[in-house]
Amino acid sequence: MTNIRKSHPLIKIINSSFIDLPTPSSISSWWNFGSLLGTCLALQILTGLFLAMHYTSDTATAFNSVSHMCREVNYGWVLRYLHANGASMFFICLYMHVGRGIYYGSYMFKETWNTGVILLFTVMATAFMGYVLPWGQMSFWGATVITNLLSAIPYIGTDLVEWIWGGFSVDKATLTRFFAFHFLLPFIISALVMVHLLFLHETGSNNPTGMPSNTDMIPFHPYHTIKDMLGFFVMMLALLCLVLFSPDMLGDPDNYSPANPLSTPPHIKPEWYFLFAYAILRSIPNKLGGVLALVLSILILVIIPLLHTSKQRSMTFRPFSQCLFWLLVADLLTLTWIGGQPVEHPYVIIGQLASILYFLIIIVLMPLTSLMENHLLKW
């Protein structure tokens, strides 16, 4: 008699994806972030569902409903801070996952990579809309500033912004639709994750050497399930420490003041995980130029497979490319720091130089370095 996990129409899909899946034996802990992202998504959907039971998407009551949740709902504060800090963990895992893809050449699986970039955009949109919902000062002004960027689009810009707002400013209609989309998008993300995994399982996983590993495969369960569980416990420990000891560390104090259209906060800034893109936006004095740079700072990931000039897939045996990669990481950390600083000297010039370096590394320096490494190895 055939084992049920290999014969049942539904269970055999799970079996071939998570149990008997042939996996390279050499993949390191950098391959844990996919499962951690799945965990984060499940956590965000669960906590978000319970938060939505107590939230009201009306400008008059939104701020008070969040306050009520934290004060009067049993463990409401845990749910709220798990959701808010869970988003931070989500983005930490996302950026590490993308970084791993760039370092080890996983972008050569073009379909998997492109669905991943679409996922990144969707998660960013979801997080932005979620930040607007508590209807604090930074929620209101963040929504106003970021949506207003669309007015830079020639001819249709102003109409587009007013269409998104549902009026002539960020108001009740905006909050209601943002809540509707914030609730809907995680389920669309879940469907996109399925597509992402479908494409990944067509080719199988990459490995640190970047070479085919068809001759050295092991089953996903129990080896990698145990390894993923370690990552899960480390992440949950970090998240719980954040939630229980310093839940507001990554938030903005301005968001504890109710939204007031008549008083602008001294420094309008998004959540920390968008600061690098915000710094690139601010570093260009022209509005349309800034918006284009903002979009391109993420969209540039799509052309990374086209810029691959090396004969080797992974950076494991390419020391010059490794130096450039870590320079890119340092540059992104610098941009994140600059995004949180006021627009004054010397932060402006540092931001502009870091923005130029960001695009320069990806578009010019990495392909040229790869060609140089090919030449050094007589290829």
Swiss-Prot record:
Any Gene Ontology CC annotation: respiratory chain complex III
InterPro entries, per the entry: Cyt_b/b6_C, Cyt_b/b6_C_sf, Cyt_b/b6_N, Cytb/b6-like_sf, Cytochrome_b, Cytochrome_b_C_euk/bac, Cytochrome_b_N_euk/bac, Di-haem_cyt_TM
A GO biological process held by the record: mitochondrial electron transport, ubiquinol to cytochrome c
Transcription among keywords: no
Keywords: Electron transport, Heme, Iron, Membrane, Metal-binding, Mitochondrion, Mitochondrion inner membrane, Respiratory chain, Transmembrane, Transmembrane helix, Transport, Ubiquinone
Single GO term (MF): metal ion binding
Major place of residence: mitochondrion
Lineage: superkingdom: Eukaryota
Protein residues bound to heme b b562: H83, H182
Binding site for heme b b566: H97, H196
Location(s) in or outside the cell: Mitochondrion inner membrane
Cofactor mode of binding and number, as noted: Binds 2 heme b groups non-covalently.
Subunit structure: The cytochrome bc1 complex contains 11 subunits: 3 respiratory subunits (MT-CYB, CYC1 and UQCRFS1), 2 core proteins (UQCRC1 and UQCRC2) and 6 low-molecular weight proteins (UQCRH/QCR6, UQCRB/QCR7, UQCRQ/QCR8, UQCR10/QCR9, UQCR11/QCR10 and a cleavage product of UQCRFS1). This cytochrome bc1 complex then forms a dimer.
Family to which the UniProt record says this protein belongs: Belongs to the cytochrome b family.
Note: Heme 1 (or BL or b562) is low-potential and absorbs at about 562 nm, and heme 2 (or BH or b566) is high-potential and absorbs at about 566 nm.
Protein name: Cytochrome b
Organism for this UniProt entry: Chalinolobus tuberculatus
